Design a protein with these regions (language model features):
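Short, hydrophobic beta-strand segments
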Residues: 103-109, 307-313, 356-362
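Short, charged/polar surface micro-motifs in flexible loops or helix N-caps
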Residues: 10, 33-36, 295-298, 350-354
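C-terminal hydrophobic structural anchor segments
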Residues: 327-383, 387
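Gly/Gly-Pro- and Ser/Thr-rich, intrinsically disordered tail segments characteristic of DNA damage-repair
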Residues: 1-227, 236-237, 367-422
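DNA-contacting surface of Y-family translesion DNA polymerases
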Residues: 183, 191-339, 355
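Short Gly/Ser/Thr- and Asp/Glu-enriched loop/turn motifs at secondary-structure junctions
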Residues: 98-102, 140-143, 283-287, 338-342
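Short, charged/polar, Gly/Pro-enriched secondary-structure boundary elements
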Residues: 112-114, 299, 352-358
Length: 422
């Protein structure tokens, strides 16, 4: 038995938690460089504001209706997510963190001693008490059904109280008959068009299809979905995320970059961030790549995009080695006379241990005390905030930095941003 817990309008809700004056007002959160809408409060949805709407096109409309806009505050969202997940892990024996705002909980054994709907309400109340965030809880025998139950809990929140238990077969069939097939987890727009052409329009229709026919005309993934809709568990709980195969840190610039020095600072910053993520995965890498590109949509400007890579002889997780390699790659592909829109650094070819055959002629041979130094660097930045310690190559006035003109304070991670109660 699974429970899917999903925070309602997560990014927008994180902003209103610390701004009670915004409750009841439409709130939207914008993407990188304040580009387009990526999160909306319930009030913003009621105004018809769609996901992905460009901010510059809707700015006057937002002002007309009193819409409050925020730049993406990823540091705040990550910390609030961690608080939610920690609460869920205390209440459930096993938890799979599926995304920043949702997680699957294993309810095996709980049904024998607790009413599942009551337990779902307890989850909602506990998360609300600790974080002031509201979650929807969908309970069912499979992950796919739990997704549908969660969808119903959020869509009909007033009637359900934000908790839907689909362990009852009759209730399952009633809900499946109401859900369009394109809203089923794992069924995309392209597949739904094919299903509609076959007369399969609802989740109930899909659940009643022959698994053999579905596998023949589609694939084994959709067959698993059919079985899951019937209550046959095909997807297990994944408590530990699989090891990453690559790490990418890339950004679009707040302003176009035409100066090599500014680009080098950006590449140093992205390489340092990628190295920090690499150490967070307890991995070492050998492959390091740098990319740069101009905007393909810029009027009367030539397009240029390129990348270069190096492969180290000895795996590393030292930021200094990764920054050095990334800058060497930049030097290979940099061209004067262009206004660059985006750059990034990618790491690959991972090793779980920094052990490999050493080479006498390796310029990136392991540095003495490297692991200890990187450990101290990460600890200080985790304790006092990202960017407390940084490399000189990253620069101080970062004119290329991502534009975030409506950024809220990092209330939970920066002492300087703590709320003052008067």
């Amino acid at each position: 038995m699974f429970a899917l817990c999903d925070v309602n309008s997560f990014y927008a809700s994180c902003e209103t938690v610390f701004r009670p004056d915004l409750r009841g007002r439409p709130v939207v959160v914008l993407s990188n460089n304040d580009g387009c809408v990526i999160a909306r409060s319930t009030e913003a949805k009621q105004l018809g504001i769609a996901m992905g709407e460009p901010y510059f096109k809707q700015k006057e409309r937002f002002q007309q209706f009193g819409v409050v806009c925020f730049s993406s505050n990823y540091e705040l969202y990550a910390d609030m997510s961690n608080r939610v997940m920690t609460t869920l892990e205390e209440m459930s024996p096993r938890v799979e963190i599926y995304s920043i705002d949702e997680a699957f909980c294993d309810l095996t054994g709980i049904r024998s001693c607790r009413d599942l709907t009551d337990f779902g309400r307890e989850i909602r109340a506990t998360v609300l008490k600790r974080t002031h965030l509201t979650v929807g809880v969908g309970i069912a025998q499979t992950k796919t059904l739990a997704k549908l139950a969660n969808h119903a809990a959020k869509k009909w929140q007033r009637q359900t109280g934000g908790v839907v238990d689909l362990s009852n077969i009759d209730r399952q069939r009633r809900l499946l008959a109401l859900v369009p097939v394109e809203d089923v987890w794992g069924v995309g727009r392209r597949i739904s068009k094919k299903l509609n052409a076959l007369g399969i329009r609802t989740a109930l229709d899909l659940s009643e299809q022959s698994t053999w026919i579905i596998r023949k005309h589609f694939n084994v993934v959709l067959e698993r979905t059919v079985r899951e809709l019937r209550g046959e568990p095909c997807l297990e709980l994944e408590e530990f995320a699989p090891a990453k195969q690559e790490i990418v840190c890339s950004r679009s610039f707040g302003e176009r970059v035409a100066d090599y020095e500014y680009m080098r600072q950006a590449i140093c910053s992205y390489a340092a961030r990628a190295a920090e993520k690499l150490r967070g995965e307890h991995q070492y890498c050998r492959f390091i790549s740098t990319l740069v590109k101009t905007s393909p949509f810029a009027m009367n400007e030539p397009y240029y995009g390129n990348n270069a890579a190096v492969k180290l002889l000895t795996p590393t997780q030292d930021s200094r080695d990764i920054i050095n390699a990334a800058v060497k790659c930049l030097d290979k592909i940099w061209r004067d006379g262009y206004r660059y829109q985006k750059a990034g650094v990618m790491l690959g070819d991972f090793f779980s241990q920094g052990v490999a055959q050493l080479n006498l002629f390796d310029d990136s041979a392991p540095r003495a005390g490297s692991e200890k130094l990187m450990e101290v660097l990460d600890q200080l930045n985790a304790k006092d905030g990202k960017g407390t310690l940084y490399f000189a190559g990253q620069g101080i006035p970062q004119q290329w930095a991502m534009k975030r003109e409506m950024l809220s304070p990092r209330y939970t991670t920066r002492f300087s941003d703590l709320l003052v109660v008067r």
